[in-house]
């Protein structure tokens, strides 16, 4: 495989959806290249036998995730692994000088204790003693943590729901324009958000022609959203978050409801707030008043489409966001973080125009 000095990227968990999307985005990237393919189940196999639909130069072999081998050929590592696995590999890579972007939830919480509570199922088989590493990891939302990401050794890429929900919400928390109580998030995602491992709820016969809520109380992403929201707002926040599974492969739509502190603010005023915050962020597009985002518009892109409306009758602010859950919600955001870490423009090599229809 061709490599670029200073931009060699190992992809661990290469055959999962996150890994596949990462590899696809790195193909043809002007400053980064794939240097190592890691995967336990497919170790020893040629890439063409694992993913014939995504050919790579020289048809490399998939290898076990040996830290020494990864460090010998890589500057960065993207870990696209189930929760509870990245925390075992990341410290070994960091010790060897490899900078890590983790797509799982293992380092998203500042507090290890909170992670152990939220991810109790995974934590039961682990003996994590890396509280200091958790607190030092940078939350990988580039539009909000860009400088910290650029200098980071370990970046924890946000979940897809937190990304879509926080992007429109944070500007209004930062400016103190909304009440911090009573925030409600209603989000809908496609089946690819469940990953590539077979699950009954994701079967065509189960998911097709049906929309269903899940994780209605205590979904894991609730506390992740609250953590970042509290950091920006500077005060305690408890919000309501309900995700829904919809019968499509990819895409995520989040609608956020909050009460304005100034009922005189208009949709035009609130749109200006978003435009001012995201003016210099090419991976965000703020739509004009009255135009509401559709998931198809963001499909196959690393762009977040944002829109806002004000209900003068109720005093409610309605924020809308559409992303591709596998790109801006996962792999694309990971590459966006590596771009910053490598000293590149954040949007380098990332698709910003959708395939439509």
Curated annotation (Swiss-Prot):
Catalytic residue list: 160
Amino-acid biosynthesis listed as a keyword: yes
Domain of life per record: Bacteria
Catalyzed chemical reaction(s): N-acetyl-L-glutamate 5-semialdehyde + phosphate + NADP(+) = N-acetyl-L-glutamyl 5-phosphate + NADPH + H(+)
GO biological-process terms attached to the record: L-arginine biosynthetic process
Keywords, comma-separated and alphabetical: Amino-acid biosynthesis, Arginine biosynthesis, Cytoplasm, NADP, Oxidoreductase
EC number assigned by the record: 1.2.1.38
Pfam families per UniProt: Semialdhyde_dh (PF01118), Semialdhyde_dhC_1 (PF22698)
Record's GO cellular component terms: cytoplasm
GO molecular function: N-acetyl-gamma-glutamyl-phosphate reductase activity; NAD binding; NADP+ binding
Annotated SUPFAM superfamilies: Glyceraldehyde-3-phosphate dehydrogenase-like, C-terminal domain (SSF55347), NAD(P)-binding Rossmann-fold domains (SSF51735)
Pathway the protein contributes to: Amino-acid biosynthesis; L-arginine biosynthesis; N(2)-acetyl-L-ornithine from L-glutamate: step 3/4
Enzyme class per UniProt: oxidoreductase
Compartments in which it is found: Cytoplasm
Alphabetized InterPro entries for the sequence: AGPR_AS (IPR023013), AGPR_type-1 (IPR000706), NAD(P)-bd_dom_sf (IPR036291), NAGSA_dehydrogenase (IPR050085), Semialdehyde_DH_NAD-bd (IPR000534)
UniProt record similarity statement: Belongs to the NAGSA dehydrogenase family. Type 1 subfamily.
HAMAP family: ArgC_type1
Stated role: Catalyzes the NADPH-dependent reduction of N-acetyl-5-glutamyl phosphate to yield N-acetyl-L-glutamate 5-semialdehyde.
PANTHER family tied to this protein: N-ACETYL-GAMMA-GLUTAMYL-PHOSPHATE REDUCTASE, CHLOROPLASTIC-RELATED, N-ACETYL-GAMMA-GLUTAMYL-PHOSPHATE REDUCTASE, CHLOROPLASTIC-RELATED-RELATED
Protein known as: N-acetyl-gamma-glutamyl-phosphate reductase
Source organism of this protein record: Synechococcus sp. (strain CC9605)
Gene name for this UniProt entry: argC
């Amino acid at each position: 495989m061709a490599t670029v000095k200073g931009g060699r990227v190992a992809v661990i968990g290469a055959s999962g959806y996150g890994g596949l999307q990462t590899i696809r985005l790195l193909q043809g990237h002007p400053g980064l290249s794939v240097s190592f393919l890691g995967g336990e189940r497919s170790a020893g196999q040629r890439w063409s036998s694992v993913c014939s639909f995504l050919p790579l130069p020289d048809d490399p072999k998939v290898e076990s995730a040996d830290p020494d081998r990864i460090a010998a050929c890589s500057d960065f590592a993207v870990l696209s692994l189930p929760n509870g696995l990245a925390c075992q590999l990341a410290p070994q890579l960091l010790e060897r000088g490899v900078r890590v972007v983790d797509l799982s939830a293992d380092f998203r919480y500042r507090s290890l204790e909170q992670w152990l509570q939220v991810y109790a199922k995974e934590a039961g088989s682990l003996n994590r003693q890396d509280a200091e590493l958790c607190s030092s990891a940078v939350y990988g939302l580039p539009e909000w943590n860009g400088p910290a990401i650029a200098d980071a050794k370990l970046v924890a890429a946000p979940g897809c729901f937190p990304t879509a929900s926080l992007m429109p919400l944070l500007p209004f928390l930062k400016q103190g324009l909304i009440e911090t109580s009573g925030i409600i998030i209603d989000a809908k995602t496609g089946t690819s958000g469940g990953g590539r491992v077979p699950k009954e709820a994701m079967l065509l016969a189960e998911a097709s022609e049906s929309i269903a809520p899940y994780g209605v109380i205590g979904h894991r992403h609730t506390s992740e959203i609250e953590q970042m929201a509290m950091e920006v707002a500077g005060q305690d926040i408890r919000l309501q978050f309900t995700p829904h599974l919809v019968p499509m492969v990819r895409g995520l739509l989040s609608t956020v409801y909050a009460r304005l502190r100034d009922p005189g603010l208009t949709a035009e005023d609130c749109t200006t707030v978003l435009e001012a915050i995201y003016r210099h962020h090419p991976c965000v597009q703020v739509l004009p008043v009255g135009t509401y985002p559709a998931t198809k518009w963001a499909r196959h892109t690393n762009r977040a489409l944002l829109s806002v409306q004000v209900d003068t009758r109720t005093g409610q602010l309605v924020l809308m966001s559409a992303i591709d859950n596998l790109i801006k919600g996962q792999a694309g955001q990971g590459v966006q973080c590596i771009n910053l870490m490598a000293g590149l423009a954040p949007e380098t090599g990332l698709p910003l125009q959708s395939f439509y229809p």
